[in-house]
């Protein structure tokens, strides 16, 4: 876990920290949208997103479209405070113009960028 440090600009033009909670996944999606990024990368503790996580029928997700990922989310496959915020941020980014989201571990990121691993969420 961990989160961002919220700051506000004071009247003097300085920045001051404030007590608040920053959702780092949604903040990342917002920043990606603002800079007109085509791809959003979210690193996490697993190489690929799974449904039925930790159960005998666990299934890894390689390439998934928005509609399918939305359905999995609505079915409750992603725990709040864990994978759910990442999925919400991913869908938000794609719905607001992004082209692809990659979710993987930092170690697998180079291979994921080559399309060799990670979960790739696309529009269609």
PLM features: residue spans?
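C-terminal catalytic "cap/lid" subdomain
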Residues: 1-124
């Amino acid at each position: 876990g961990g989160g961002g440090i919220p700051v506000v600009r004071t009247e003097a033009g300085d920045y001051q920290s404030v007590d608040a909670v920053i959702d780092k996944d949604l903040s990342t999606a917002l920043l990606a949208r603002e800079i007109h990024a085509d791809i959003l990368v979210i690193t996490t503790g697993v190489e690929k997103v799974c449904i039925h996580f930790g159960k005998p029928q666990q299934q890894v997700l390689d390439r998934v479209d928005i509609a399918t990922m939305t359905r999995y989310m609505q079915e409750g496959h992603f725990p709040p405070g864990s994978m759910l915020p990442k999925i919400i941020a991913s869908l938000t980014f794609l719905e607001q113009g992004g082209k692809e989201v990659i979710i993987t571990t930092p170690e697998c990121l180079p291979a994921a960028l080559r399309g060799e691993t990670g979960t790739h969420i696309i529009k269609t």
